[in-house]
């Protein structure tokens, strides 16, 4: 009989209803839900009661560090003093399991994960549980951000055999690494409706001793089934599906799950999911004259505005938290992830391009201000995340959200100044509290605070418009804006004195690539050269610290060392598909923002390496990992869902299209078509699970615009034309600067550039689309009209 328990923390954006995708979101909130274990298994398990204790009493507490002390990962180092005899993922652990004929206990998480902290504190620091693990299992700890391939393979098993997934992910493997039982967070002891970790360990231990052959057979059967289920191949298909059909179906599925009042999609917990917003903007552009097109734009803009006004946004320190635990975007899970900041900075810039509303550009600037201040290494790289938990005061146990919460008393003490010109007696603190919904009792529903840690605390969330707040107190809008900004700055300065949340100072190539895109796109759209410079510094960091010149390969990780140094793991952790895809995207965005062709050259080189390491020459599309790197794993998978991060295959499809437009090389287009064809069945089945790939499908079937500007890169007229292009939302384009040098890199790639001439010695634009060329344009206003058509 299987273990039955309440639902697990949801994995990677799992949504109930409305046909929305289970993407790559992280586990949901610790508040308002029973965060019990989820157990999946491929074999019968004994029912009821605790298993018999088959081992001698545990030894005296172990004070020395385990072998994880030699690792670089912040997550592994957090477990380096556990009594558990942890191994990192590797041959030493596998050999030990085979030699001693023991199952492997694999635990996967990441350093800013609330429930990973909980399980470590409750179970992995427990001497008796540590002894139980050491005697009966080979225990392996993995940082999912270092080894996304390991995470994806075993999460596929957990999701397929249980009601969901999340982190920490705990899976039991045969010595040959095939999974047979899996789950998420386990409490240490049995409860009324849930099975404790100690009991699960003893049951599995008994089963391994009594029914090992059955375990092995069932494990092999499940692995075979997962392999067949995860197959993605061109098969006998010749072409990808119709973009018009996939667009329409994807939009309809999103429309069905849309929250009319608060924006967003499906039920709480609500995630930002920028890939969905990107799709809606693209859908609007190609359906502007239709009701559905207007609806798509409204859905995206309303969602972005509600998110920015909600508690999911840090109004004091800027940036966005991981997700909202309620449909109102009010109470967040307070973790902050680099990849969210990167993608949201881009989508808020797109909202500004489309609407012209500076509200959206201000949000984008705030995100990038936060990243610059909190997540940036001085050499140009970007850190991974900040934890949700921090001590309310020094020496106290960390609590979720402690850094971000406020009491009325605190705000009154910080902002006691009277507001001049108000229609009634009013302090700056009272104005801020009214605008952001603070109350004496706190504005957090007790059902969202199951541990009672947030009583009397408040999350800042915009309750009224500036106009309404001003009207309530007889103040001008600009006066209200200034008073609120001053108040928020004082709160920010006060917050500096609180204990900081843990910073995961691991730097990942993939997420750094996304952040290069964020700074490059924002810099070009907003006309802020300093942001383009930060993107450039990020790309230089990648090339200096995360690129192996001799092999041309990317390294997955590096780490912040003492004194601002950068440290590498030894041996290096080599890049995965997402590292190449996201870095290539970042370099292409940086090329368009800076017009420095060296970034395009590097992008082409990385794309070549990506094709050699990850391309499936038989079935089409890209595998997540290199063939050699994943030889130990039972599955070699292809990333097939756009979630918190876009699928690397979706991003690669866009990259291939752009590279074809920038070089004219037919191979890139052929690969793109093959990739889209391989994913045909996935798109047809649930297009809303791949909105970024549906966008790529549309771009491939509609063809890209080639916008060529002939001019001196430093001349004012050239810059005016470039800024005109950057200010308009044109997702399916490539932007090329032809400086007239026939020996330049781009002229060698696209010989026709040498034939283009400036008109009357002025910077001139030519637009190529559907094998046709526009008349030459020199006037930015005329160019704007043409691009808006």
UniProtKB/Swiss-Prot annotation:
CDD domains attached to this UniProt entry: SSP411 (cd02955)
Gene3D superfamilies for this protein: 1.50.10.10, Glutaredoxin
Keyword Transcription regulation applies: no
UniProt region (Disordered), positions on chain: 1-65
Keywords from the UniProt entry: Developmental protein, Differentiation, Phosphoprotein, Secreted, Spermatogenesis
GO cellular component labels: extracellular region
InterPro entries tied to this protein: 6-hairpin_glycosidase_sf (IPR008928), 6hp_glycosidase-like_sf (IPR012341), Ssp411 (IPR024705), Ssp411-like_TRX (IPR004879), Thioredoxin-like_sf (IPR036249)
One Pfam match: Thioredox_DsbH
GO biological process: one example: cell differentiation
Subcellular location(s) of the protein: Secreted
Biased composition (Basic residues): 1-19
Positions bearing Phosphoserine: 5, 652
Signal peptide residue numbers: none
UniProt note on tissues of expression: Testis-specific and age-dependent (at protein level). Highly expressed. Expressed in round spermatids located in the inner half-layer of the seminiferous epithelium as well as in early elongated spermatids having cytoplasmic protrusions into the tubular lumen.
Domain of life: Eukaryota
PANTHER family assigned to the protein according to its UniProt record, in alphabetical order: SPERMATOGENESIS-ASSOCIATED PROTEIN 20 (PTHR42899:SF1)
Function: May play a role in fertility regulation.
Name of the molecule in the record: Spermatogenesis-associated protein 20
Originating species: Rattus norvegicus (Rat)
């Amino acid at each position: 009989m299987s273990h039955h328990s309440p639902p697990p923390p949801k994995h990677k954006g799992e949504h109930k209803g409305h046909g929305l995708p289970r993407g790559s979101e992280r586990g949901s909130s610790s508040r308002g839900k029973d965060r019990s274990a989820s157990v999946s298994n491929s074999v019968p398990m004994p029912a009821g009661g605790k298993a018999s204790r088959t081992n001698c009493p545990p030894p005296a507490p172990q004070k020395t560090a385990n072998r994880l002390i030699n690792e670089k990962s912040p997550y592994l180092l957090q477990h380096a003093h556990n009594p558990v005899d942890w191994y990192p993922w590797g041959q030493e652990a596998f050999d030990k399991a085979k030699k001693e004929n023991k199952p492997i206990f694999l635990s996967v998480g990441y350093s800013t994960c609330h429930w990973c902290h909980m399980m470590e504190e409750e179970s992995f620091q427990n001497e008796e549980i540590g002894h139980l693990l050491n005697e009966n299992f080979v225990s392996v700890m993995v940082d999912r951000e270092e080894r996304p391939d390991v995470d994806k393979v075993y999460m596929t098993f957990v999701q397929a055999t249980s009601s969901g997934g999340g982190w920490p992910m705990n899976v039991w493997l045969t010595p040959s690494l095939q999974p047979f039982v899996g789950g998420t967070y386990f409490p240490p002891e049995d409860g009324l409706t849930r099975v404790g970790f100690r009991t699960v360990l003893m049951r599995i231990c008994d089963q391994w001793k009594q029914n090992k052959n059955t375990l092995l057979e069932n494990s092999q059967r499940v692995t075979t089934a997962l392999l067949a289920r995860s197959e993605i191949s061109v098969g006998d298909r010749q072409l990808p599906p119709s973009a018009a059909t996939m667009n329409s179906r994807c939009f309809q599925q999103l429309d069905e799950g849309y929250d009319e009042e608060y924006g967003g999609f499906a039920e709480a917990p609500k995630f930002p999911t920028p890939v969905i917003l990107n799709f809606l903007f693209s859908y609007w552009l190609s359906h502007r004259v239709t009701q559905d097109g207007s609806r798509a734009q409204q859905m995206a803009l309303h969602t972005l505005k509600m998110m920015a006004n909600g508690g999911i946004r840090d109004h004091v320190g800027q940036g966005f938290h991981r997700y909202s635990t309620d449909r109102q975007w009010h109470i967040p899970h307070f973790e902050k992830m680099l990849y969210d900041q990167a993608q949201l900075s881009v989508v808020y810039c797109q909202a500004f391009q489309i609407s012209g509303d500076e509200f959206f550009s201000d949000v984008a600037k705030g995100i990038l201000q936060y990243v610059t201040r909190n997540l940036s290494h001085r050499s140009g790289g970007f850190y991974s995340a900040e934890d949700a938990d921090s001590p309310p005061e020094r020496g106290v146990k960390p609590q979720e959200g402690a850094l971000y919460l406020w009491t009325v008393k605190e705000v009154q003490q910080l902002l006691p100044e009277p507001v001049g010109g108000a229609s009634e007696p009013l302090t700056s603190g009272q104005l801020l509290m009214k605008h952001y919904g603070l109350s004496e009792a706190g504005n957090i529903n007790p059902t969202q605070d199951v541990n009672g840690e947030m009583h009397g605390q408040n999350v800042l969330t915009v309750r009224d418009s500036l106009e309404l707040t001003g009207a309530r107190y007889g103040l001008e809008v600009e006066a209200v804006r200034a008073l609120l900004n001053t108040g928020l700055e004082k709160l920010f300065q006060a917050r500096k004195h609180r204990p900081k949340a843990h910073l995961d100072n691991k730097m990942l190539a993939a997420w750094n690539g996304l952040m290069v895109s964020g700074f490059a796109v924002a810099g070009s759209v907003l006309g802020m050269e300093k942001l383009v410079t930060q993107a450039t510094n990020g790309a230089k960091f990648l090339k200096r610290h995360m690129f192996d010149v001799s092999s041309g390969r990317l390294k997955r990780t590096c780490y912040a060392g003492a004194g601002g140094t950068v440290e590498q793991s030894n041996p290096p952790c080599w890049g995965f598909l997402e590292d190449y895809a996201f870095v290539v995207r970042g370099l292409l965005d940086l090329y368009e923002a800076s017009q420095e062709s060296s970034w395009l050259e590097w992008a082409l080189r990385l794309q070549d390496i990506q094709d050699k390491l990850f391309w499936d020459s038989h079935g089409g599309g890209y595998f997540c990992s290199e063939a050699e790197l994943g030889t130990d794993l039972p599955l070699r998978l292809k990333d097939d869902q756009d979630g918190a991060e876009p699928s690397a295959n979706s991003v690669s499809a866009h990259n291939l299209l752009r590279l074809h437009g920038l070089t004219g090389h037919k191979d890139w287009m052929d690969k793109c078509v093959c990739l889209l064809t391989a994913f045909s069945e996935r798109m047809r089945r649930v297009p809303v699970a791949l909105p970024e790939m549906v966008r790529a499908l549309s771009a491939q079937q509609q063809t890209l615009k080639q916008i060529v500007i002939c001019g001196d890169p430093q001349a004012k007229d050239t810059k005016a034309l470039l800024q005109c292009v950057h200010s308009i939302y044109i997702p399916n384009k490539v932007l090329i600067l032809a400086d007239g040098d026939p020996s330049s890199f781009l002229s060698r790639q696209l010989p026709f550039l040498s034939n283009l001439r400036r008109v009357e010695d002025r910077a001139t634009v030519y637009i190529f689309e559907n094998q046709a060329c526009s008349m030459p344009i020199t006037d930015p206003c005329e160019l704007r009209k043409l691009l808006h058509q």
